[in-house]
Design a protein with these regions (language model features):
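Active-site core segments that coordinate phosphate-bearing ligands/cofactors
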Residues: 1-187
């Protein structure tokens, strides 16, 4: 959406390079990524996308980075909700187009505090189907064996503790911003 409407025809790589010019936390700019309502974990079909914290000293780079961070905050919100139910995740695997961005993957690692592994194959659906078939046909004795024998990592990104501290504060603002705006979304 951002690239199409505000990106001025720039490529994803160009937008990401511009985002890298803004510091972690986007100097206070937050983006709620609820462009089509939001499902898990808030389940609010009326939620809207929001840029917050704009001032004349902010650049398009701040906006781009805040979009990347907003998606990462949504991921962290889901991980926190899962943890409340006893599901704890230590490592994340990132696949698909967004995983091609080293910056965005690093932002997700920093926000969540989790190691993120990026496999060499970005055809997750096809590979997943092949793994299911391989286990079903007895080629592999278990899903764990199938994964260990078929998936190779291109890179592993560890969270940066300094950035994590910045993002922890921003995450609390992100959650509070949604709560403060929630009633207005249905107007």
């Amino acid at each position: 959406w951002f690239r199409q409407e505000l990106g001025g025809g720039m490529s994803f790589d160009e937008l990401t390079a511009e985002a890298a010019e803004a510091p972690p936390g986007s100097d206070g700019v937050l983006f709620l990524p609820y462009m089509a309502g939001e499902r898990s974990p808030i389940w609010n079909p009326d939620a809207k996308g929001v840029f917050y914290g704009l001032s004349f000293d902010k650049t398009r780079g701040h906006l781009i980075r805040s979009v990347l961070e907003g998606v990462a905050f949504s991921l962290e919100h889901n991980l926190r909700t899962a943890a409340e139910t006893g599901i704890h995740v230590d490592t994340l695997n990132a696949m698909g187009g967004a995983s091609n961005s080293v910056l965005w993957t690093q932002i997700k690692a920093d926000v969540t505090g989790k190691t993120i592994r990026v496999p060499s194959s970005d055809t997750a659906t096809t590979l997943g189907a092949a793994i299911l078939a391989g286990v079903g046909c007895g080629i592999y004795g278990s899903y764990g064996e199938a994964v260990n024998r078929t998936i190779r990592m291109t890179r592993v990104q560890e969270p940066n503790p300094e950035n994590k501290a910045v993002y922890d504060r921003a995450m609390e603002r992100y959650l509070r911003l949604y709560e403060d705006l929630k009633e207005g979304f249905s107007l």
